[in-house]
Amino acid sequence: MVNQHTAHQLPFASQPPLASAQLAPTLISLDDWALATMVGPDTVKYLQGQVTADVSALADDRHILCAHCDAKGKMWSNLRLFHHGEGFAFIERRNLRDAQLSELKKYAVFSKTTIAPDDNAVLLGAAGAGIRELLASAFSQLPDADHPVVQHEGATLLHFAHPAERFLLVLSPEQSASLLEQLGDKVSLNDSRQWLTLDIEAGQPIIDSANSAQFIPQATNLQALNGISFSKGCYTGQEMVARAKYRGANKRALYWLAGKANQVPQAGDDLELQLGENWRRTGTVLAASQLQNGEVWVQAVLNNDLTAENVLRVREDADSQITVQPLPYEITD
């Protein structure tokens, strides 16, 4: 019998992460991510004035990656937002959740909405070849590309199409323990770095505390991920976000870079771009991961005119060489 609270309290043992094409069925403890919930009659109205997405148009069976910005249009965080129970929930990086929630709550005293962290739920990733078939043995209904959110018996299941089909499971400790018991010998286990690696490959921006309030949403490709509504009403930071679109003020984009490096850069580090015989500091690292084969993957915000021909390196790592990889979507204005 699996201890009910094992997955809830402890991350799975860390294994070197793999690219989606090499990944066997794997359950992933998402301890580096955290959940928050919002309930109450004013929740939609309140969220509508705080985030970049059109919350009133979010169907029960959809999730969306949107941004919560400051007055200058810089993102406190990005949020994976979805319907959950009687209200909404969102997932973000754990290391900035408390700071982001304090910003989100600033004006909530005037609204009938309750915003709270939720550490009772267990967040698990499920990815790798054949993972749908394995999950289908444990859940009677699974989300898919047409209906990316399913709520079932208190569990909320999210579907992601990229970089390959994967799922994010919001479970009770009991449901998590039951799933582990049922699938235990059929899946590998890994920690948050595997999910982070898949997010890098999918071009899904990862905002940690080091990069909070540093970037407008478009600098992290949020418009290309349909995370910004340009037709909804006012929200905090809207003027700057709209200006970036209509006046062409945004000159940056999010990139996936891959190659060799002696060190894995940290969130907030800069990179160096080769210009002839010289190197120039550029960009900001959002996240990075070293794979099982030794390759280093980096997600970074850089000038939006880079191409696959550009050569970059980790700062002050003369032997490193990383280049732009194709994302599974087109970067739009």
UniProtKB/Swiss-Prot annotation:
It is found in: Cytoplasm. The keyword Cytoplasm applies. SUPFAM superfamilies: Aminomethyltransferase beta-barrel domain, Folate-binding domain. Pfam families: YgfZ_barrel. GO terms for cellular component: cytoplasm. InterPro entries: GcvT/YgfZ_C, tRNA-modifying_YgfZ, YgfZ/GcvT, YgfZ/GcvT_CS, YgfZ_barrel. GO terms for molecular function: folic acid binding. Coiled coil: none annotated. Keywords: Cytoplasm, Folate-binding, tRNA processing. GO terms for biological process: iron-sulfur cluster assembly; RNA modification; tRNA processing. Folate binds at W33, W195. Folate-binding protein involved in regulating the level of ATP-DnaA and in the modification of some tRNAs. It is probably a key factor in regulatory networks that act via tRNA modification, such as initiation of chromosomal replication. Belongs to the tRNA-modifying YgfZ family. This is tRNA-modifying protein YgfZ.
